[in-house]
């Protein structure tokens, strides 16, 4: 794992924004040329579409209002925070090699990624540094675009603005020079800092200082703690200057706990061979180490997950309830009213990792809280929260569960089904309780169609759907891979056919297409959550199958596209929700076309090229199902993967099948009307690449 950082035009844009603000105060005559370059870059990178703020082109820009232009100022304020979010996004730097611990910069960045996150016993590295420096914001939860207020370096006379690349004072009067990097050891990539000092105006700039300093401390710690023989216990912390007590505590933990655990990555191979030989393999915890669970290290152990009777855990309930309110707030701000209906996909693997964040959120949305046993902390019941306590109406939630969730968590199916029935029986108004109102309405409908009262009541209360017993997935992957579909309606129907099986506390997998279509016809929101940043929504087909498939199905049945949201629960103390289009854009800019990620993939030959192709496939499939990809993204992928000469040569030499497949996929996107704004010359180049790749493959006898 590593920070995405900025690159190319995005890096230039950040520098120009700083110059613009500086010129407003010091040299207004420079504003016009800076503005012209800013506008050109904004349109070049399509940021005006991404941020939803229309900026006229250079030709159409109104003259005479440069210094006070409200639209441009609004854009720059928004863009500043957005660029900071992209810069601090976590992406993978290459692939894990089985049995090998990362080395050099990969090890440094992985340690920082894990140590950054707090848990019950630790502050987290960057938070500890900020606390020792007396900085009055939380780097893990603060708005990166917010103006920096009363944030000065300790033991220095107040000299705002601070500057990146200058001396950063430590709490005891010592200092460390952030640029150039002090690390000269072979294989160390220095921390990237601005060529010229940059004013620190917003919290995102200060967070970058913390991240750079944390990386330098960790790199020095690794150099003094690690040798060819392994990780000696109690390694000295030979860093320049004195370190604050909170930072020292974090560094001690890294030296004595985290680094030794990472060094034991070779246990993956050792224990695999032990298992094949019928020997004992030690057990260990499971989860995401970058989400505050470093106890899952070292890897290579026989991991255990959770006691399903304790799910959702109290910790998961806290996050789930918070995430529910964040979602409702976002929808209410955008639509001016509370949401009434929502579809949520829930997977078994994420439930195991988190202890039940998603099911907790679903319960919170309908206004139900689990009840835990006082000793075992197992879930023994639930209680209905009054609307007066909720402070909002309930939300009618329908779950689309994965096959693994169905197999692993039958107790949660029972819990949610019982909760739905209890909420449906409440005597509340339709405004307070859309779920009960919908159940009553549907019950009458089914009675009119000849069902008995019991049958009508049962069918109207179906709120958990999945694939039929023994089946897994959502039915779309085969269609996408084989190109065996004509329109979005084909994909929608495949999803419906695969998903229309109802699960209750009394029945497993009842074919219920009419009830499922009823749910789809009323659904306003499609929500997909992600619990960690060790991967993203373009790393797996599951995301487009579940969220994209549900989105397409709702559009097919109701005739209206739902609001598609993506929940980011990677920071448990600060869950966020974005529109799906925003998340796609974020992943596209931070990873997909990021030279840093591409370079990491290129270290892995054949497999690295396959990762690039898979990313394009999932981007295409998301667009086919949810219409969430902009034309410039297809062009950007073509430019980064196929039209960049060094990357093209890498792919051609290591995996010519990928060159053919990616070019064909881009051509398919154009043929299906997903990529419309494209030059004929670009399409011709892609066709030529297909032919060239076919020739290489044939010449190799494959």
Mark where each language-model region is.
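Ser/Thr/Pro/Gly-rich low-complexity, intrinsically disordered segments
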Residues: 159, 179-184
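Ligand/cofactor-recognition surfaces for anionic moieties
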Residues: 1-156, 163, 167-177, 191-702
């Amino acid at each position: 794992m590593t920070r995405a950082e900025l690159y190319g035009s995005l890096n230039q844009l950040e520098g120009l924004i700083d110059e613009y603000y500086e010129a407003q105060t010091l040299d207004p005559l420079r504003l016009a040329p800076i503005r012209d370059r800013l506008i050109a870059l904004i349109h070049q990178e399509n940021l005006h579409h991404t941020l939803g703020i229309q900026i006229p082109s250079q030709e159409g820009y109104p003259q005479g209002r440069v210094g006070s232009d409200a639209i441009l100022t609004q854009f720059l304020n928004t863009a500043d925070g957005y660029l900071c979010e992209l810069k601090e996004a976590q992406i993978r730097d290459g692939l894990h090699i089985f049995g090998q611990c990362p080395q050099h910069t990969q090890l440094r960045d992985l340690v920082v990624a894990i140590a950054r996150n707090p848990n019950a016993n630790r502050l987290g590295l960057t938070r500890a540094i900020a606390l020792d420096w007396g900085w009055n914001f939380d780097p893990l939860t603060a708005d990166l675009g917010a103006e920096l207020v009363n944030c000065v370096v300790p033991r220095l006379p107040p000299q705002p603005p601070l500057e990146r690349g200058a001396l950063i004072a430590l709490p005891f009067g010592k200092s460390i020079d952030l640029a150039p990097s002090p690390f000269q050891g072979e294989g160390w990539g220095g921390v990237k800092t601005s060529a010229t000092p940059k004013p620190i105006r917003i919290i995102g700039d200060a967070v970058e200082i913390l991240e750079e300093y944390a990386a330098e401390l960790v790199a020095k710690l690794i150099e003094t703690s690690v040798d060819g023989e392994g990780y000696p216990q109690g390694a000295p912390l030979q860093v320049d200057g004195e370190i604050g007590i909170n930072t020292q505590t974090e560094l001690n933990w890294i030296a004595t706990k985290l680094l030794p655990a990472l060094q034991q990555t070779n246990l993956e191979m050792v224990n695999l061979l032990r298992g094949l030989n019928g020997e004992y393999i030690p057990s260990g915890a499971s989860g995401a180490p970058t989400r505050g669970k470093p106890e899952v290290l070292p890897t290579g152990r026989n991991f255990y997950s959770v006691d399903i009777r304790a799910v959702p855990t109290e910790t998961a309930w806290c996050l789930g309830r918070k995430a529910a309110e964040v979602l409702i707030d976002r929808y209410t701000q955008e639509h001016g009213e509370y949401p009434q209906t929502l579809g949520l996909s829930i997977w078994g693997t994420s439930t195991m990792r988190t202890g039940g964040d998603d099911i907790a959120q679903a319960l919170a949305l309908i206004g139900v809280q689990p009840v835990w046993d006082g000793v075992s902390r197992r879930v023994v019941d639930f209680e209905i929260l009054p609307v007066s306590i909720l402070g909002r109406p309930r939300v009618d939630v329908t779950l689309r569960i994965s096959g693994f969730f169905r197999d692993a968590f039958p107790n949660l199916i029972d819990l949610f089904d019982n909760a739905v029935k209890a909420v449906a029986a409440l005597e509340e108004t339709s405004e307070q309780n859309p779920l009960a109102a919908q159940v009553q309405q549907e019950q009458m409908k089914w009675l009119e169609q000849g069902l008995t009262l019991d049958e009508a009541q049962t069918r109207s209360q179906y709120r958990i759907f999945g694939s039929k017993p023994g089946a897994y997935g959502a039915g779309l992957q085969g269609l996408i891979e084989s190109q065996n579909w004509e329109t979005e309606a084909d994909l929608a129907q495949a999803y419906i056919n695969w998903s229309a099986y109802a699960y209750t506390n009394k029945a497993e997998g009842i074919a219920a297409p009419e009830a499922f279509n009823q749910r789809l016809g009323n659904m306003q929101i499609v929500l997909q959550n992600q619990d960690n940043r060790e991967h993203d929504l373009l790393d797996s087909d599951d995301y487009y199958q579940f969220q994209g498939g549900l989105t397409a199905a709702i559009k097919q049945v109701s005739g209206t596209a739902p609001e598609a949201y993506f929940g980011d629960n990677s920071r448990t103390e600060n869950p966020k929700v974005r529109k799906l289009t925003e998340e796609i854009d974020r992943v596209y800019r931070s990873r997909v076309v990021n030279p840093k990620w591409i370079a990491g993939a290129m270290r892995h030959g054949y497999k690295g090229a396959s990762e690039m192709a898979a990313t394009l496939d999932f981007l295409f499939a998301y667009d086919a199902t949810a219409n969430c990809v902009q034309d410039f993204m297809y062009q950007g992928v073509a430019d980064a993967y196929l039209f960049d000469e060094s990357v093209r040569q890498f792919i051609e030499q290591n995996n010519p099948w990928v060159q053919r497949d990616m070019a064909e996929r881009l051509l398919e996107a154009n043929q299906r009307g997903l990529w419309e704004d494209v030059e004929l010359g670009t399409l011709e180049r892609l066709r030529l690449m297909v032919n060239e790749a076919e020739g290489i493959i044939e010449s190799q006898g494959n």
